[in-house]
Amino acid sequence: MSQIPFTVSARTAKLIGQENFSNAEGAIIELVKNTYDADSQYCFILFENIGTLNATIYIIDFGCGMNDTTIQNCWMTIGTDDKLFNIKSDNGRIKTGAKGIGRFALNRLGNYTTMYTVPEKSDIGYKWTVDWSYFDKPGITVSDIYASINNIDPKDVKSKIYHLIEEKKIIKEIPPFQNGTVLEITQLNDVWDIEAIKSLSANLEILVPPFNTEEFSIFLYSPFTDLKGKINKSESDDYDYKISSSYKADKDQTLIINITRNELVTSALEQEYKELFKYETMQKYPYT
């Protein structure tokens, strides 16, 4: 009895990824999560030339970067189990990104991607490029599609990052760059108008740690005056119940849940407005 292998069409692999990112906003949020997983303290999202054929999205982090082995064995492997078994980053963060399909978020955003990355303690950087339109060709399997990778000087990546961030003036002092990644997405699939970027900005707030910490900061730049600068954490005191949870990822897989009540306390109202309730009109319905 002979055995034959399964094959996966390139289009099917692409569709699996797209099902997880039904809109462009979700795709960007996924890529921001990846910067957090890379132990970056900063994430920069830059929109350039919006409304033109040269529209570009940049996502920049100062994380651990990737070497050529990681690019080939993890980044280039669809559905990799790396985050399934390595649930914590080197700095102890619980990884939040999708398990092995996050790179398809790039395809959701645009047809062409260039990645510049510098791994930790390395004097070599890497430039990775892919044309996602190849995934739409009929009769093509995943193994028929190639991305290109070349060695680059880390100084060139540093120069590119500083140029992109400095000219936008969204941060007073650019953090020192030793390692990290730049994602450059072109031939965009969506129109990024003011409403789209405003919605993105609002949803990015939930990714900012809720406490007064500089552990992870997100910066956004767009051509719209009110939509540039540091993303602040989402704050709301208008709630009845607030649930917070923390997952320790220990051998017992401990999950801690805290519930805070903020309900209307009628006794406090009666005390605060006790003089009001003494009025004759407040003694009988309809209280007017």
Feature-to-residue mapping (PLM):
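GHKL (Bergerat-fold) ATPase N-terminal catalytic module, capturing the glycine-rich phosphate-binding loop
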Residues: 1-185, 194
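N-terminal assembly/transducer modules of large multi-domain enzymes
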Residues: 142, 147-288
